């Protein structure tokens, strides 16, 4: 179990509403084969189930909530603000969970299966604005779900000093856009 609170400089503007973000995680596993004393080790020598959940944050780009006016030395002036300042931006947030199973069986085989799912929200981008005095505005929209399965099957054996170790893997991943701002497709 973990917990962390970040105070990144991107959120530190004088008018920023969200100056920090907290993200926790928790994970656990149980070795089921240790809980079964009568287990025939020739058939199933090891079995573990595991699970975890985490929520992580990622700040948006610099100066989105804390506008700056760089000095243009060769012109001897401050630059104009071209991005509309936003003060209530939230960090990008990803909530994810994972379930897995690890096994060793028939003396020489091993299997590992994992299912995962992650949802990312508050994705920040800055589309062009129509004529308004500003050229861009930061908006937070968009949610994406990323989920999939990972599977590996292995075999290991030794005969008279010769070792054979092989493995096969399979994975599938699906990304789905859950929400987008209206007319935000490029």
Residue ranges of model-derived segments:
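Extracellular/periplasmic, surface-exposed regions of secreted and cell-surface proteins
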Residues: 1-186
């Amino acid at each position: 179990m973990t917990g962390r609170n970040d105070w990144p400089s991107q959120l530190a503007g004088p008018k920023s509403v969200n100056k920090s973000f907290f993200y926790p995680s928790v994970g656990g596993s149980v070795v089921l084969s240790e809980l079964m004393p009568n287990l025939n080790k020739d058939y199933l020598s090891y079995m573990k189930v595991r699970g975890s959940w985490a929520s992580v944050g990622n700040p948006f780009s610099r100066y989105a909530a804390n506008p700056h006016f760089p000095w243009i030395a060769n012109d001897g002036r401050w630059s104009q603000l071209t991005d509309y300042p936003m003060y209530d931006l939230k960090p990008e947030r990803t909530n994810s969970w994972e379930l897995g199973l690890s096994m060793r069986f028939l003396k020489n085989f091993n299997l590992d299966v994992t299912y995962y799912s992650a949802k990312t929200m508050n994705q920040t981008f800055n589309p062009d604005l129509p004529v308004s005095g500003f050229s861009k505005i930061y908006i937070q929209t968009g949610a994406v779900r990323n989920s999939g399965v990972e599977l590996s099957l292995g075999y290991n054996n030794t005969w008279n000093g010769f070792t054979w170790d092989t493995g096969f893997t399979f994975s599938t991943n699906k990304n789905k856009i859950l929400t987008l701002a209206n007319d935000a497709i490029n």
